[in-house]
C-alpha cells in the first residue's frame, strides 16, 4: 500500500494534464505531494527524508511554473532531482564513506563491498542519464511527449534498472542466501 501511495502524485499529474493543461497539472502535483506528506505523518508518524526533499523540490519548481506560467521550471525539476540523487550517491560514498544503496538493502542482501560499489556507481550513471535524457525530451520534443516520458518512460526505465540491479546482486550473493531467497 505504501508503494502505491508514492505513485499517487504522478498519477494525478498525468490525469489532470490530460484533462486540463500543464499548469493545472503542476498545481495538482504540488497539492497532492503535500497531502501525501501529511498522510505519511498521520498514518506512520514520520516523514521520510526523501519524501520531504521531493516535496520541497516539487513545491519550489511547481510554484515557479504556476507563478510565471512557464513549464520550463517543472521540466527542469526532473533533471535536478535525478542529478541530485546521482550526486548524493557519489558524495555519500566517496565523501563520507557510506554507500546508500548498501545501507538500504544490506539487511536483506549480503554482498561484497566491491559489488555494492559497482551497484552504487551504476545508479549514479542511471540517474545522470535520466537527468540528461529528460533535458533532451523536455526541450526538444512536444510537451505531451515530455509528460508521457516523465510518467511512463522514466518509471519504466527505473523499474527495469531496479530489476537489473537485483539480478546483478543476486549473482553475487553467497549460496546459502540464494537458497533462502528461493523459499
UniProtKB/Swiss-Prot annotation:
GO cellular component, one term: plasma membrane
Keyword Lyase: no
InterPro entries: YciB
UniProt KW keywords: Cell inner membrane, Cell membrane, Membrane, Transmembrane, Transmembrane helix
Domain of life: Bacteria
Membrane topology: Multi-pass membrane protein
Residue ranges crossing the lipid bilayer per the database entry: 22-44, 54-74, 76-96, 119-139, 149-169
Compartments (UniProt record): Cell inner membrane
Pfam families, A to Z: IspA
UniProt key word Membrane: yes
Major localization listed first in the record, in broad terms: membrane
NCBIfam families: ispZ (TIGR00997), PRK00259.1-2 (NF001324), PRK00259.1-3 (NF001325)
Similarity annotation: Belongs to the YciB family.
Function: Plays a role in cell envelope biogenesis, maintenance of cell envelope integrity and membrane homeostasis.
UniProt name for this protein: Inner membrane-spanning protein YciB
Gene this protein is translated from: yciB
Amino acid at each position: 500500500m505504501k508503494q502505491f501511495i508514492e505513485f499517487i502524485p504522478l498519477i494525478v499529474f498525468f490525469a489532470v494534464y490530460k484533462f486540463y493543461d500543464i499548469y493545472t497539472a503542476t498545481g495538482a502535483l504540488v497539492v497532492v505531494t503535500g497531502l501525501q506528506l501529511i498522510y505519511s505523518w498521520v498514518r506512520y508518524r514520520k516523514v521520510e527524508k526523501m519524501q520531504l526533499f521531493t516535496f520541497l523540490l516539487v513545491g519550489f519548481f511547481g510554484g515557479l511554473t504556476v507563478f510565471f506560467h512557464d513549464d520550463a521550471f517543472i521540466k527542469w525539476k526532473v533533471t535536478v532531482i535525478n542529478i541530485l540523487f546521482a550526486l548524493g550517491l557519489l558524495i555519500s560514498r566517496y565523501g563520507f564513506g557510506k554507500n546508500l544503496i548498501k545501507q538500504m538493502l544490506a539487511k536483506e542482501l549480503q554482498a561484497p563491498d566491491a559489488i555494492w560499489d559497482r551497484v552504487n556507481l551504476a545508479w549514479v550513471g542511471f540517474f545522470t542519464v535520466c537527468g540528461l535524457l529528460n533535458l533532451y525530451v523536455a526541450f526538444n520534443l512536444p510537451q505531451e511527449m515530455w509528460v508521457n516520458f516523465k510518467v511512463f518512460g522514466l518509471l519504466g526505465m527505473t523499474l527495469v534498472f531496479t530489476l537489473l540491479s537485483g539480478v546483478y546482486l543476486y549473482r553475487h550473493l553467497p549460496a546459502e542466501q540464494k537458497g533462502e531467497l528461493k523459499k
